[in-house]
């Protein structure tokens, strides 16, 4: 299931067209290759690309710290899975809420678990469709990853997700354009409190 979706489906073509029609000039960079920063020295050195993963590049508009000392967020990535029921039972026992950053293709495998997470009062957010490092994808593939993830979550629980976390924290400047267009937020950081959730490490 963890396969990057094709970009030639009618749905993805529509999402691509919507992004193109947004009036925003979205830069296009060559995808990186497997191996991270050492395997991609030119991309890592490109300040225009602003590859956060390789150098911590941020923009002046990015929120990168929690607004108050000792703020933190409890989060879980990569589900739902067969481990989710035990985790939900534990969270209920200790009266904790969390944010589940879910992988779209796994929602198809375990739709009832996503519904249970949501009905128990937990936040649901996007962790892409197939869990790839996003800089290894083309712009069109990123649109497909985000679009299908948004759709499967909305189809399963009736709610549009407002947050997302990129797998492996792999992001660059261009990524915010897609998140704004597909999710309607100014960035994948949906406010200062959310950034505490996004960067929390369970």
Q: Where on the chain are the PLM-derived regions?
A:
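Core nucleotidyl-transferase/polymerase catalytic module
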Residues: 136
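Generic hydrophobic, helix-prone segments enriched in Leu/Val/Ile
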Residues: 15-20, 48, 181, 202
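Poly-acidic low-complexity segments
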Residues: 1, 133, 157, 195-201
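N-terminal, immediately post-signal peptide pro-regions of secreted/luminal proteins
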Residues: 1-31
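Active-site beta->alpha N-cap acidic-glycine motif
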Residues: 20-133, 141-166, 171-172
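His/Asp/Glu-enriched short active-site or ligand-binding loop at hydrolase and phosphoryl-transfer sites
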Residues: 176, 180-202
């Amino acid at each position: 299931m963890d396969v990057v979706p094709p970009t030639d489906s009618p749905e993805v073509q529509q999402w691509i067209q919507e992004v193109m029609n947004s009036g925003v000039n979205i830069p296009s960079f060559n995808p990186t290759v497997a191996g991270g920063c050492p395997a991609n020295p030119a991309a890592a050195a490109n300040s225009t690309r602003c590859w956060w993963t390789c150098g911590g590049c941020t923009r002046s508009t990015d929120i990168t710290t929690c607004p108050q000392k000792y703020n933190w967020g409890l989060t879980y990535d990569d589900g739902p899975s067969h481990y989710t029921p035990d985790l939900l039972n534990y969270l209920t026992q200790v009266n904790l809420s969390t944010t589940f950053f879910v992988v779209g293709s796994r929602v198809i495998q375990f739709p009832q678990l996503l519904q249970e997470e949501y009905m128990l009062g937990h936040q649901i957010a996007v962790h892409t469709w197939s869990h790839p490092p996003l800089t290894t994808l083309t712009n069109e593939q990123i649109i497909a990853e985000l679009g299908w993830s948004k759709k499967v979550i909305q189809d399963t629980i009736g709610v549009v997700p407002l947050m997302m976390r990129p797998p492996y924290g792999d992001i660059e400047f261009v990524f915010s354009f897609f998140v704004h267009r597909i999710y309607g937020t100014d960035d994948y950081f949906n406010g200062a409190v959310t950034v505490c959730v996004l960067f929390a490490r369970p």
